[in-house]
């Protein structure tokens, strides 16, 4: 816990929400202990939520017999079995099954055909049906099997992939050297230095959908490349796009979210689409990796989590692979993570992203796109243009609720997502988890969350309830992000820059106190500094209390002066409290790790704190994390 003298060295900031309209033209995580180009990356820390451990290694194969007659007999039996399997068509499965072999060799092309090849091969009735093949579904079927060991679970996914984790797609996978990427393109190093695949389980964990109903011990089958068109809730049936009906006992909708597009690209020609990527899936990652040739110019459109993470990751990718890429990041906010972070911290973050080699263009929007001379020309709203080789659109996502209209399910008009009750039920025997669920939070009101931790926890709880547990969803989910070597943060609750914030940052060298007559301070809309804040501490340090420039000024000179003042600050480590009705509803832990449980308790108390400076002591701002060397 911080001593009183240490606390006065902290820099306290109070921010009010900005209210001005946005003007035109004016991103698992980094790898702790991994040295890249002489710099140590500290970031991905122990995840707060329960994690599913990777599967245990299979037992060693039995020793070979040296008896020649037995070997000859075995060869004959094997040949006969292979011949029978060929006649039965068991070798007609989708080639995607071989793409993540134990050797990690990348397949040249992935088949887009469904598996099994025909919907006639799918079970006509299953006890548990999960629609969607992402993290929420994975957590759900693990929970179901945990409570019903012989459960028979069918997962229907519209992707040609087994369930996999998405966070590494914008982070760790880009840090692999060329030779490793060629052999093991979908493996990454975790925060603890251990390497693993993005796939949650190896393929032999799953059972063939055609064998599911006959399996004496049950199992989980993944039907890939199929789409559910409608749910008959009354009769408990899922109807596929080709009319195939599958009856279920319990059903989960884990349809996730899909990436948003921009009008300029939606209205563009088909040729433009060849030069753009709506980044979301492993297929997007692989295609983008192939398109990033040496010397390419890449525009990333979007300043939120995905856009900022990709910008930093691609810059590091360029350095590791010696690609000499030019990375541009364009967004309409005034700084990176502008919808999440207080404005002063957003400005500071933008400067750190630029230090990573990214050319950041804030307050910029694209109004048109066209292909010229095999290049993509982006016309901006101020009529200037940017010519690049490829554009990545990362402007957020929207819940996939297509089933709502065809199945008469309720969607929240403001937040989107299927409306569910406390047990994550949308209707009887029909549950929703992950990005597509709009649930009620007793402390924060109705919410919809698009983060990995929420997908894991909501999927697990939905699976338990499908197995008969009837538990309410009370978890306050967290999320994390890493932007280069200097920024790694965890957050929980309502984290929105439109809310008032109070931040406490640790300062190694105490800043000079800015008197309340300072022109710069006035330009920043500073509050009067209380005497207690300017009085010397026992260590001779002082603290400054500022009100960040949340309201956009009418004149650019004032805004520039405020920004210049902010640039002199160093926000390396701190805690930001987000307030609503003077109660803490969200917390960002800025380069502070393994304290998310404390933040969760503060939000759960749902009370007014007279002195958030005292609350900040709970996070031990001056503790130093232990450094561990990479293997």
Question: Predicted segments — roles?
Answer:
Residues 126-150, 306-317:
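N-terminal Rossmann-like FAD-binding beta1-loop-alpha1 element of flavoenzymes
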Residues 73-80, 84-129, 143, 202-299, ...:
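FAD-binding core/adjacent interface of flavoenzyme oxidoreductases
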Residues 1-67:
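N-terminal mitochondrial targeting presequence
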């Amino acid at each position: 816990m911080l001593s009183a003298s240490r606390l006065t060295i902290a820099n306290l900031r109070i921010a009010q929400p900005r209210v001005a309209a946005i003007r035109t033209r004016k991103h698992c995580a980094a790898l702790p202990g991994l040295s890249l180009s002489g710099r140590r990356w500290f970031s991905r820390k122990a995840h707060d939520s329960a994690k599913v451990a990777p599967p245990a290694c299979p037992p060693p194969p039995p020793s070979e017999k040296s008896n020649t007659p037995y070997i000859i007999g075995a060869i004959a039996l094997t040949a006969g079995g292979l011949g029978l399997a060929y006649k039965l068509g068991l070798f007609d499965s989708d080639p995607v099954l071989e793409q993540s072999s134990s050797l990690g060799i990348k397949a040249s092309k992935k088949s887009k055909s469904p598996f099994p090849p025909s919907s006639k091969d799918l079970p006509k009735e299953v006890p548990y049906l999960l629609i969607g093949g992402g993290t929420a579904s994975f957590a759900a079927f693990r929970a179901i099997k945990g409570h019903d060991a012989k459960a028979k679970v069918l997962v229907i996914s519209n992707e040609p992939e087994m369930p996999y984790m998405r966070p590494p797609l914008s982070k760790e996978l880009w840090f692999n050297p060329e030779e490793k990427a060629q052999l093991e393109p979908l493996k990454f190093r975790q925060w603890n230095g251990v390497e693993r695949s993005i796939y949650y389980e190896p393929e032999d964990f799953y059972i063939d959908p055609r064998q599911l109903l006959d399996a004496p011990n049950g199992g989980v089958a993944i039907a890939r490349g199929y789409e559910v068109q409608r749910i008959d809730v009354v009769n408990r049936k899922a109807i596929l796009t080709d009319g195939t009906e599958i009856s279920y006992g319990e059903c989960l909708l884990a349809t996730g979210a899909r990436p948003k597009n921009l009008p300029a690209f939606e209205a563009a020609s088909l040729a433009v689409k060849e030069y753009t990527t709506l980044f979301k899936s492993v297929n997007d990652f692989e295609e983008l990796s192939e398109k990033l040739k040496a010397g390419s110019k890449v525009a990333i459109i979007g300043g939120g989590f995905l856009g900022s993470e990709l910008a930093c990751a691609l810059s590091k990718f360029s350095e590791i692979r010696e690609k000499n890429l030019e990375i541009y990041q364009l967004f309409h906010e005034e700084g990176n993570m502008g919808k999440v972070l207080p404005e002063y911290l957003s400005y500071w973050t933008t400067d750190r992203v630029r230090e990573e080699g990214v050319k950041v263009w804030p307050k910029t929007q694209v109004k048109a796109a066209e292909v010229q001379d095999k290049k993509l020309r982006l016309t901006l709203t101020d009529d200037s243009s940017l010519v690049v080789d490829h554009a990545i659109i990362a402007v957020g996502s929207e819940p996939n609720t297509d089933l709502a209209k065809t199945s008469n399910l309720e969607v929240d008009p403001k937040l989107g997502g299927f409306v569910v009750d406390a047990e994550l039920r949308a209707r009887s025997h029909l549950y929703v988890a992950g990005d597509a669920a709009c649930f009620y939070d007793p402390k924060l009101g109705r919410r919809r969350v698009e983060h990995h931790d929420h997908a894991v926890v909501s999927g697990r709880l939905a699976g338990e309830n499908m197995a008969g547990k009837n538990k309410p969803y009370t978890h306050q989910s967290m999320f994390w992000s890493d932007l280069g070597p200097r920024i790694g943060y965890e957050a929980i609750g309502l984290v929105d820059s439109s809310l008032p914030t109070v931040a406490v940052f640790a300062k190694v060298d105490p800043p000079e106190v800015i008197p309340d007559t300072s022109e710069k301070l006035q330009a920043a809309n500073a509050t009067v500094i209380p005497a207690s804040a300017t009085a010397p501490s026992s260590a001779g340090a002082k603290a400054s209390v500022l009100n960040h420039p949340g309201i956009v000024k009418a004149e650019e000179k004032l805004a520039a002066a405020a920004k210049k003042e902010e640039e002199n600050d160093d926000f390396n480590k701190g805690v930001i409290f987000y307030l609503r009705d003077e109660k803490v509803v969200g917390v960002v832990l800025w380069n502070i790790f393994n304290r998310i449980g404390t933040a969760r308790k503060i939000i759960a108390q749902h009370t007014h704190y007279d002195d958030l400076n005292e609350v900040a002591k709970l996070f031990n701002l001056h503790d130093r994390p232990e450094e561990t060397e990479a293997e």
